């Protein structure tokens, strides 16, 4: 497999366009599946991580790119992917998008049926949270491709969001199947589901609403096949769970297993020994979030269990090596590489820029991304060899990093101005 830096010399052959690309969860997934990708990302810090990782990037606002710079997107792109920012829809956010869910469904239909985009934008603005409008961007990108000369409709579409967005994905699927209005007769096979990440080998409990759409003739779309059992701490020993119910036998992966495995890899920044007591993993984690609606009732996970959902506040979770540390109120914190491993990023992924915990928490878990993208593009699960290779990120030459930065941010007058409030870039050697 070619290293990610080979994408720099020419953008020809890029197949996947990742909207709201973040530090690169879907791009990492695409890389290990053998597909070239390019991401559009607003946040400069996430862009710095992407450059360091050798990921082709345009530092820009997704809506500005669509309106004013669409011709810069390689014509070879066949797959539209992305996860619009979830804060306005998430149970961990303020919920403006959740309150407006029914209205947003109508916006989707209004957009497809050709109503004035200016009026739609004004109505979206009146919802009070500008991020809510971003969930329409993938549909707007598809319409732009259909209505632009010498462009083709995307062959596949892959979207993910928090579970509360599933009703919107269902409306997306409805209009994609219809091919009506501004879709100009271009119909898609489309399905959507809520997936649990621990059932796909991610060592954390996280649920995501996923939509997969393909042009007709590329095969029926079926739900990605789970590879691991779901986590339920009330069932007792995970290895005694009834695999007949779920059709798989492999238990979910624990925090201890994931961190131990990463620690054993050559040159790993993950040091599992710091979490051991007398040679064994006994640590436990107290969540930054309350449970059962009580903010004072912080949840607890043992090292033998998957992590809580890794959010942008992951650095606030308290990690205790043992009961004595807890009683002495001497907590530790997960490092950024450790948090990345719990998201299934490669152990040596070159996190860069500021707000790295936020970057980690905002990302799509690459292992889940591999399963979803492989399902969408091949109709099958990723191979064992591909999943195994995804543990380590290839080295990226410094010259490649600089070339990517020049492509993504060379003309800073076109970059989102608010996103330049970052610390000076630290030069780093190739990982």
Spell out what each predicted region is:
Residues 2-10:
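Conserved alpha-helix/loop element of class I SAM-dependent methyltransferases that forms part
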Residues 17-66, 81:
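SAM cofactor-binding core of SAM-dependent methyltransferases
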Residues 12-15:
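Extreme N-terminal starter segment of soluble prokaryotic enzymes
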Residues 67-77, 91-302:
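Class I S-adenosyl-L-methionine
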Residues 2, 264-431:
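C-terminal target-recognition/interaction regions appended to catalytic cores
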Residues 77-83:
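Short SAM/SAH-binding signature in class I
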